Structures are given as structure tokens and as C-alpha cells.
A protein has these predicted regions:
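Gly/Ser/Thr-rich phosphate-binding loops and adjoining beta-strand/alpha-helix segments
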Residues: 1-53
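A structural signal for short secondary-structure junctions
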Residues: 42-45, 65, 125-129, 160-165
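Extended hydrophobic-aromatic, low-complexity segments
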Residues: 21-22, 35, 98, 144-147
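Glycine-rich, charged/polar anion/phosphate-binding loops
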Residues: 36-37, 55-58, 117-122, 154-155, ...
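Helical lid/core segments from catalytic subdomains that handle acyl or acyl-like groups
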Residues: 7, 57, 61-141
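Low-complexity, glycine/alanine/valine/leucine- and proline-rich hydrophobic stretches
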Residues: 129-168
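Solvent-exposed, non-transmembrane amphipathic alpha-helical segments
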Residues: 43, 47, 51, 55, ...
Length: 168
């Protein structure tokens, strides 16, 4: 069942965490539960997830186009305590956002887009080899959407996968 956004915000406010922190921590807990149900030992295990970081300055928030970098988040799926896991995710993300990783990734993505296909394929393979999952969130529209005078009843969003990434 979906988790109401208001509940996610309440948890985040109470524990000093962002919506992303809470959601990534929940996904980590769900993945750990799934793996344990399949017989895997998750004690002390981390899962490396590729997570986008917004690099667009607030004064340009209205402009079209993407301006994001990527970071490799160590998601502590081996932490059973959900509050401890949330704090670990929060600290990991804060550290990564302030690092060189997002800006470097933005530069690599720009080079990939401007370079030949061989360069694109090589760099994409390197990125894909270093993560087991790609995770992001996209807020749902705050008002109904219409296409050709027909109201859109629902949206299906997915994260582009590459290589052997198993989760998106």
C-alpha cells in the first residue's frame, strides 16, 4: 500500500530528516526484509544505490531541463532499527551532497552526451558496475493533468536501468 506523503513529512520533521531520507530508509528496510525472506543474511550489509542530486540553483528552478549529478549512496540495509537506518541514510546523503561526486557526475554526463557512442557506452558501463540500484522520487502532480482534452487517470513512472542494475 502507498505511504501517505503527509505521514512521510511528519516522520521527517520529527526526526530532522528530508522526505528523500525517509523514503530511501524505508526502501532500504523493505529490501532487507525481502532479502531476509529469501534466506540472505543482511547483517551489516550495505547496498550501493545511484541517487540523483539536484544541482540547479533556486533562482533557476523555473527553467526547463535537467541539472543533476549522481552520487553512490551506501544504503545500510543491514540496520534493522529503522530510526538508526534513517539517521545513517541522512548522514550519508548530507556528506555526499557536499562532496565533489554530484558535480563530477554532472560533468561526466555532459561529456557522455557530447561524445561518441563508444564513450557513452563505456562510461555508462562503469557507472552501472558500481551500483546495485538506481533510486529517485518524482512528486506526483498537485492538480489533474489533461492530454488532448482527456483527463489522465494515472501515471506510471520508472527509472532508466542500465547494465545489471536490479532495482530502480
Amino acid at each position: 500500500d502507498p505511504i501517505p506523503l503527509d505521514e512521510v513529512k511528519t516522520v521527517g520533521r520529527a526526526l530532522g530528516a528530508s522526505i528523500n531520507d525517509v523514503l530511501l530508509s524505508c526502501v532500504g528496510g523493505a529490501l532487507a526484509s525481502y532479502l531476509r525472506d529469501k534466506g540472505d543474511d543482511t547483517d551489516g550489509v550495505t547496498l550501493r544505490a545511484l541517487v540523483p542530486v539536484n544541482l540547479r540553483p533556486m533562482e533557476r528552478a523555473y527553467k526547463l531541463g535537467n541539472q543533476f549529478g549522481l552520487v553512490f549512496l551506501e544504503l545500510p540495509i543491514g540496520m534493522e532499527n529503522p530510526v538508526a537506518r534513517l539517521y545513517a541514510v541522512r548522514e550519508n546523503l548530507r556528506s555526499l551532497r557536499g562532496s565533489y561526486q554530484p558535480v563530477l557526475a554532472l560533468g561526466i554526463l555532459a561529456a557522455m552526451g557530447a561524445g561518441p557512442k563508444l564513450l557513452q557506452d563505456t562510461l555508462l558501463a562503469i557507472l552501472a558496475r558500481n551500483a546495485s540500484a538506481v533510486m529517485t522520487n518524482v512528486p506526483e502532480p498537485q492538480q489533474p493533468l489533461w492530454l488532448a482534452a482527456a483527463r489522465i487517470a494515472g501515471l506510471l513512472l520508472w527509472v532508466p536501468q542500465s547494465g545489471d542494475d536490479g532495482v530502480g
